[in-house]
Design a protein with these regions (language model features):
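Short amphipathic alpha-helical segments and helix-helix/interface helices
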Residues: 33, 74-78, 170-172, 233, ...
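Residues that line or immediately flank small-molecule/substrate-binding pockets and catalytic motifs
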Residues: 8, 65, 219
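Helical hinge/lid and interdomain linker segments adjacent to catalytic or ligand-binding clefts
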Residues: 18-102, 224
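Sec-dependent N-terminal signal peptides
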Residues: 3-13
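Extracellular ligand-binding/catalytic regions of CAZymes and related secreted enzymes
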Residues: 17-23, 28, 34, 106-108, ...
Length: 241
């Protein structure tokens, strides 16, 4: 009889768990939502125009916005994180379009320099093969249930890696704050022959009472189907400091 009463109590937190919120203007997040569901995380997808006025009740808010980021949405995201929320910023939520949102970029602690890529200027390439490299082998987000299927040389070290055959890469993100680096990127520009190795493909940082995280890969949505990458994003959603 004790077991019969205990079972509902153990299951109750799972049944009562609130969905995470995905704010998006792109189809690729549908694949992410499926992957989160497969990992036991329910999600609700909205546009920035239809998002709830208050975000405080969500255990995590994921942002995937390619186009213009409205002032109202920007403020809501920043307030949510600073008030104790977990804001997960994906792919082109940091891109040249977001230069129009200096408050957003300052909050993230990222700048996108002008100028030629060879001189440190921001540039994107698409579609290209990209290697994501584990730079945090002791961090829970980068390791918990993550089965890395590849290895790559990175700054003279052999590291766990994810090989993405066709995605979009952003070069020369400049990080200006106390970012905890999770993922690096390795990309070979076939035209110039230059190999770029940068510690900018995944990170997180404190945002007053909460957290903000960023993961670069996700242009087509197929990236979210990679088992290791899907698990990393699941870990980000489930992260408890």
């Amino acid at each position: 009889m004790k077991l019969l009463f205990l079972f509902p109590l153990l299951c109750y937190p799972l049944l009562a768990a609130k969905s995470v919120l995905i704010v998006s203007d792109g189809v690729p997040v549908q694949i992410l939502a499926v992957q989160l569901k497969a990992h036991g995380i329910n999600s609700e997808t909205v546009t920035q125009q239809s998002m709830p006025a208050k975000l405080a009740g969500y255990p995590a808010v994921l942002v995937y916005i390619h186009g213009v980021l409205s002032e109202a949405a920007e403020k809501a995201f920043i307030d949510y994180a600073k008030s104790g929320g977990k804001l997960i910023v994906l792919h082109h939520s940091i891109s040249s379009q977001k230069r129009q949102n200096p408050g957003w970029m300052q909050f993230l602690g990222v700048s996108l320099p002008e100028g030629d890529v060879t001189q440190g200027g921001y540039k994107y390439y698409d579609p290209v093969p990209l290697t994501l490299v584990n730079l945090a082998p002791k961090d829970w987000i980068a390791t918990h249930d993550v089965h890395w299927e590849s290895r790559a040389e990175y700054r003279g070290e052999d590291r766990d890696a994810i090989e993405l055959p066709a995605t979009e890469v952003y070069l020369n993100h400049v990080l200006n704050g106390q970012h905890i680096i999770l993922l690096g990127l390795k990309f070979i520009d076939k035209k110039s022959g230059v190999t770029y190795v940068q510690d900018t493909a995944g990170w997180y940082k404190k945002a007053e009472k909460g957290w903000v995280m960023y993961f670069m890969a996700g242009h087509s949505g197929k990236e979210f189907d990679d088992p290791a990458y899907a698990q990393i994003l699941t870990n980000a959603v489930n992260f408890r400091p």
